[in-house]
Protein backbone atom coordinates (compact mmCIF):
# COMPACT_ATOMS: atom_id res chain seq x y z
CA UNK A 1 0.00 0.00 0.00
CA UNK A 2 1.31 3.45 -0.91
CA UNK A 3 0.62 5.39 2.26
CA UNK A 4 2.19 8.56 0.90
CA UNK A 5 -0.86 9.28 -1.26
CA UNK A 6 -3.24 9.07 1.70
CA UNK A 7 -4.11 12.04 3.90
CA UNK A 8 -2.88 12.13 7.48
CA UNK A 9 -6.49 12.05 8.65
CA UNK A 10 -7.26 8.94 6.60
CA UNK A 11 -4.18 7.18 7.94
CA UNK A 12 -4.98 8.15 11.52
CA UNK A 13 -8.42 6.58 11.09
CA UNK A 14 -7.27 3.43 9.32
CA UNK A 15 -4.24 2.83 11.56
CA UNK A 16 -5.11 4.08 15.08
CA UNK A 17 -1.56 3.77 16.40
CA UNK A 18 -0.34 5.96 13.54
CA UNK A 19 -1.25 8.96 15.66
CA UNK A 20 1.69 8.29 17.99
CA UNK A 21 4.01 8.07 14.98
CA UNK A 22 2.70 11.37 13.63
CA UNK A 23 3.23 13.05 17.00
CA UNK A 24 6.78 11.68 17.10
CA UNK A 25 7.57 13.56 13.90
CA UNK A 26 5.33 16.57 14.64
CA UNK A 27 2.95 15.81 11.77
CA UNK A 28 -0.43 17.48 12.34
CA UNK A 29 -3.07 14.81 11.72
CA UNK A 30 -5.95 16.69 13.34
CA UNK A 31 -6.13 20.30 12.12
CA UNK A 32 -3.82 19.51 9.20
CA UNK A 33 -5.34 16.11 8.58
CA UNK A 34 -6.31 16.78 4.95
CA UNK A 35 -2.71 17.02 3.70
CA UNK A 36 -1.17 13.87 2.24
CA UNK A 37 1.63 12.05 4.01
CA UNK A 38 3.96 12.91 1.15
CA UNK A 39 3.16 16.63 1.37
CA UNK A 40 3.49 16.71 5.17
CA UNK A 41 6.76 14.76 5.10
CA UNK A 42 8.15 17.03 2.41
CA UNK A 43 7.44 20.14 4.45
CA UNK A 44 9.44 18.72 7.35
CA UNK A 45 12.11 17.11 5.15
CA UNK A 46 11.33 13.64 6.50
CA UNK A 47 12.21 10.32 4.87
CA UNK A 48 8.95 9.22 3.27
CA UNK A 49 10.14 5.63 2.81
CA UNK A 50 10.94 5.38 6.52
CA UNK A 51 7.51 6.72 7.44
CA UNK A 52 5.80 4.27 5.10
CA UNK A 53 7.79 1.39 6.58
CA UNK A 54 6.79 2.41 10.11
CA UNK A 55 3.15 2.69 9.05
CA UNK A 56 3.28 -0.75 7.42
CA UNK A 57 4.50 -2.22 10.71
CA UNK A 58 1.67 -0.56 12.62
CA UNK A 59 -0.87 -1.57 9.98
CA UNK A 60 0.08 -5.23 10.46
CA UNK A 61 -0.66 -5.15 14.19
CA UNK A 62 -4.08 -6.26 15.44
CA UNK A 63 -6.30 -3.35 16.55
CA UNK A 64 -6.36 -2.76 20.29
CA UNK A 65 -8.73 0.21 20.47
CA UNK A 66 -12.47 0.57 19.99
CA UNK A 67 -13.37 0.89 16.33
CA UNK A 68 -14.91 4.35 16.21
CA UNK A 69 -15.40 4.00 12.46
CA UNK A 70 -18.32 1.66 13.16
CA UNK A 71 -19.40 2.41 16.75
CA UNK A 72 -22.75 4.20 17.18
CA UNK A 73 -22.40 7.98 17.35
CA UNK A 74 -24.42 7.89 20.57
CA UNK A 75 -21.53 5.92 22.05
CA UNK A 76 -18.85 8.18 20.60
CA UNK A 77 -20.26 11.46 21.89
CA UNK A 78 -20.36 10.51 25.61
CA UNK A 79 -16.85 9.10 25.20
CA UNK A 80 -15.59 12.41 23.77
CA UNK A 81 -17.19 14.39 26.60
CA UNK A 82 -15.92 12.14 29.38
CA UNK A 83 -12.48 11.33 27.96
CA UNK A 84 -11.57 14.72 26.51
CA UNK A 85 -13.90 17.58 27.50
CA UNK A 86 -13.91 16.73 31.20
CA UNK A 87 -10.19 16.00 31.14
CA UNK A 88 -9.31 19.33 29.52
CA UNK A 89 -11.35 21.11 32.19
CA UNK A 90 -9.14 19.45 34.81
CA UNK A 91 -5.82 19.82 32.99
CA UNK A 92 -5.72 23.48 32.05
CA UNK A 93 -6.41 25.17 35.42
CA UNK A 94 -3.63 23.12 37.04
CA UNK A 95 -1.23 23.91 34.20
CA UNK A 96 -2.01 27.61 34.53
CA UNK A 97 -1.19 27.53 38.26
CA UNK A 98 2.15 25.84 37.58
CA UNK A 99 2.96 28.22 34.72
CA UNK A 100 2.30 31.24 36.92
CA UNK A 101 4.65 29.82 39.56
CA UNK A 102 7.43 29.07 37.07
CA UNK A 103 7.16 32.53 35.52
CA UNK A 104 7.21 34.18 38.95
CA UNK A 105 10.04 32.18 40.52
CA UNK A 106 12.27 31.97 37.44
CA UNK A 107 11.48 35.31 35.80
CA UNK A 108 15.16 36.29 35.58
CA UNK A 109 16.24 33.13 33.72
CA UNK A 110 16.68 33.31 29.97
CA UNK A 111 14.65 30.13 29.42
CA UNK A 112 11.68 31.38 31.47
CA UNK A 113 8.51 30.92 29.37
CA UNK A 114 7.23 34.47 29.77
CA UNK A 115 3.59 34.71 28.68
CA UNK A 116 2.89 30.98 29.00
CA UNK A 117 0.29 31.32 31.75
CA UNK A 118 -1.53 33.97 29.73
CA UNK A 119 -1.50 31.78 26.63
CA UNK A 120 -2.81 28.77 28.56
CA UNK A 121 -5.54 30.98 30.03
CA UNK A 122 -6.54 32.06 26.52
CA UNK A 123 -6.69 28.41 25.45
CA UNK A 124 -8.82 27.54 28.50
CA UNK A 125 -11.25 30.39 27.81
CA UNK A 126 -11.61 29.57 24.12
CA UNK A 127 -11.78 25.81 24.63
CA UNK A 128 -14.37 26.14 27.40
CA UNK A 129 -16.66 28.13 25.09
CA UNK A 130 -16.00 25.70 22.26
CA UNK A 131 -16.82 22.59 24.29
CA UNK A 132 -19.94 24.22 25.73
CA UNK A 133 -21.23 24.93 22.21
CA UNK A 134 -20.60 21.33 21.22
CA UNK A 135 -22.33 19.95 24.30
CA UNK A 136 -25.33 22.30 24.15
CA UNK A 137 -25.89 22.65 20.40
CA UNK A 138 -23.98 20.33 18.07
CA UNK A 139 -23.91 17.07 20.00
CA UNK A 140 -27.66 17.14 20.81
CA UNK A 141 -28.36 17.72 17.09
CA UNK A 142 -26.30 14.67 16.15
CA UNK A 143 -27.82 12.54 18.90
CA UNK A 144 -31.29 13.53 17.67
CA UNK A 145 -30.46 12.22 14.19
CA UNK A 146 -30.03 15.69 12.67
CA UNK A 147 -26.41 15.26 11.61
CA UNK A 148 -27.16 16.07 7.96
CA UNK A 149 -28.52 19.45 9.06
CA UNK A 150 -25.46 20.23 11.21
CA UNK A 151 -23.11 21.42 8.45
CA UNK A 152 -23.14 25.00 9.77
CA UNK A 153 -22.24 24.23 13.39
CA UNK A 154 -19.70 21.62 12.27
CA UNK A 155 -17.97 24.17 10.03
CA UNK A 156 -17.69 26.56 12.98
CA UNK A 157 -16.27 23.82 15.22
CA UNK A 158 -13.69 22.84 12.60
CA UNK A 159 -12.59 26.46 12.26
CA UNK A 160 -12.19 26.69 16.02
CA UNK A 161 -10.16 23.47 15.96
CA UNK A 162 -7.80 25.17 13.50
CA UNK A 163 -7.51 28.12 15.90
CA UNK A 164 -6.67 25.73 18.74
CA UNK A 165 -3.91 24.19 16.64
CA UNK A 166 -2.40 27.64 16.10
CA UNK A 167 -2.59 28.35 19.83
CA UNK A 168 -0.66 25.15 20.55
CA UNK A 169 2.09 26.32 18.20
CA UNK A 170 2.46 29.45 20.34
CA UNK A 171 2.83 27.25 23.44
CA UNK A 172 5.52 25.19 21.71
CA UNK A 173 7.39 28.36 20.77
CA UNK A 174 7.23 29.78 24.30
CA UNK A 175 8.53 26.52 25.79
CA UNK A 176 11.24 25.69 23.23
CA UNK A 177 9.07 22.79 22.07
CA UNK A 178 8.44 21.72 25.67
CA UNK A 179 12.16 21.47 26.47
CA UNK A 180 12.97 22.50 30.07
CA UNK A 181 16.49 23.80 30.79
CA UNK A 182 18.99 21.39 32.32
CA UNK A 183 18.66 23.03 35.75
CA UNK A 184 14.85 23.22 35.71
CA UNK A 185 13.06 22.59 38.99
CA UNK A 186 10.51 19.81 39.40
CA UNK A 187 7.58 22.18 38.90
CA UNK A 188 9.03 23.39 35.61
CA UNK A 189 9.55 19.83 34.40
CA UNK A 190 6.10 18.75 35.58
CA UNK A 191 4.57 21.75 33.81
CA UNK A 192 6.09 20.86 30.46
CA UNK A 193 5.23 17.17 30.90
CA UNK A 194 1.64 18.14 31.71
CA UNK A 195 1.43 20.42 28.69
CA UNK A 196 2.73 17.57 26.55
CA UNK A 197 -0.03 15.31 27.85
CA UNK A 198 -2.63 18.02 27.21
CA UNK A 199 -1.44 18.53 23.64
CA UNK A 200 -1.56 14.77 23.00
CA UNK A 201 -5.09 14.59 24.39
CA UNK A 202 -6.28 17.63 22.44
CA UNK A 203 -4.87 16.30 19.16
CA UNK A 204 -6.60 12.95 19.71
CA UNK A 205 -9.79 14.83 20.63
CA UNK A 206 -9.76 16.97 17.47
CA UNK A 207 -8.84 13.99 15.31
CA UNK A 208 -11.79 11.98 16.61
CA UNK A 209 -14.20 14.83 15.87
CA UNK A 210 -12.79 16.16 12.57
CA UNK A 211 -12.00 12.84 10.94
CA UNK A 212 -14.66 10.52 12.38
CA UNK A 213 -17.59 12.07 14.26
CA UNK A 214 -18.28 15.02 11.96
CA UNK A 215 -18.02 13.20 8.60
CA UNK A 216 -20.17 10.34 9.87
CA UNK A 217 -22.77 12.75 11.24
CA UNK A 218 -22.92 14.64 7.94
CA UNK A 219 -23.51 11.34 6.14
CA UNK A 220 -26.53 10.79 8.34
CA UNK A 221 -25.08 7.88 10.29
CA UNK A 222 -26.46 7.16 13.75
Curated annotation (Swiss-Prot):
Cellular compartments annotated: Cytoplasm
Q: Which sequence ranges form a coiled-coil region, renumbered to this chain? A: none
Q: Which Gene3D superfamilies match?
A: nmb1532 protein domain like
NCBIfam families per the record? FeS_repair_RIC, PRK10992.1
Q: Which family does it belong to?
A: Belongs to the RIC family. YtfE subfamily.
Describe the protein's quaternary organization and the partners it interacts with.
Homodimer.
* Stored PANTHER family: IRON-SULFUR CLUSTER REPAIR PROTEIN YTFE
Q: What does this protein do?
A: Di-iron-containing protein involved in the repair of iron-sulfur clusters damaged by oxidative and nitrosative stress conditions.
Q: What is this protein called?
A: Iron-sulfur cluster repair protein YtfE
Amino acid sequence: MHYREKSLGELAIAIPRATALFREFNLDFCCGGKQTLQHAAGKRQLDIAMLEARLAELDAEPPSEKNWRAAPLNDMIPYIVQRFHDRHREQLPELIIMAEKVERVHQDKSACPHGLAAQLTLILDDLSQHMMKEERILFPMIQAGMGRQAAGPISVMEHEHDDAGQQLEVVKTLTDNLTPPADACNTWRALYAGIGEFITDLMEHIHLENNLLFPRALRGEA
